[in-house]
Amino acid sequence: MSDLKKFAEQLVNLTVKEVNELAAILKEEHGIEPAAAAPVVVAGGGAQGGDSKAAEEKTHFDVILKSAGASKLSVVKLVKDLTGLGLKEAKDLVDAAPKPIKEGAPKAEAESLKSKLEEAGAEVELK
């Protein structure tokens, strides 16, 4: 069971680039479409959404870039560094805001990412 916990922790801490690579591997080598997993995630999230205590005790957050603000170049560079994406991919992600920068991040990490992005001039939301 501890191996599964380690795997789950590694999975939660993947960067956006690593998630994209994982999706490509699952699709190419195993025929699993990433969209097939989406209903499972939505269904799981919906079941917990009705419990107000669970919402108050949330420990993992999605870091959502709402806009780059006035310092777009600084935000693109920071997104590149934080996610491990290439410069073009980071720029595309910033241009497509609102977009998640990191999903399922522990509370401390999510708050740290939010403060770094806000210091660079971005508008960020934790969900």
From Swiss-Prot:
Cite the entry's keywords alphabetically. Answer: Ribonucleoprotein, Ribosomal protein
Q: Name one GO cellular component term.
A: cytosolic large ribosomal subunit
Q: Which domain of life is it from?
A: Bacteria
What biological processes does GO assign it? Answer: translation
Q: Mind telling me which Pfam families this protein's record contains?
A: Ribosomal_L12, Ribosomal_L12_N
Q: Where is this region: Disordered?
A: 98-127
The membrane spanning regions, by residue number, are: none
* Molecular function terms, GO-annotated: mRNA binding; structural constituent of ribosome
State the similarity comment.
Answer: Belongs to the bacterial ribosomal protein bL12 family.
What HAMAP family is this protein classified in? Ribosomal_bL12 (MF_00368)
Please give the function described in this protein's UniProt entry: Forms part of the ribosomal stalk which helps the ribosome interact with GTP-bound translation factors. Is thus essential for accurate translation.
Record's subunit section: Homodimer. Part of the ribosomal stalk of the 50S ribosomal subunit. Forms a multimeric L10(L12)X complex, where L10 forms an elongated spine to which 2 to 4 L12 dimers bind in a sequential fashion. Binds GTP-bound translation factors.
Question: What's this protein's name?
Answer: Large ribosomal subunit protein bL12
| Species the sequence originates in | Amoebophilus asiaticus (strain 5a2)
Its taxonomic path starts at: Bacteria, Pseudomonadati, Bacteroidota, Cytophagia, Cytophagales
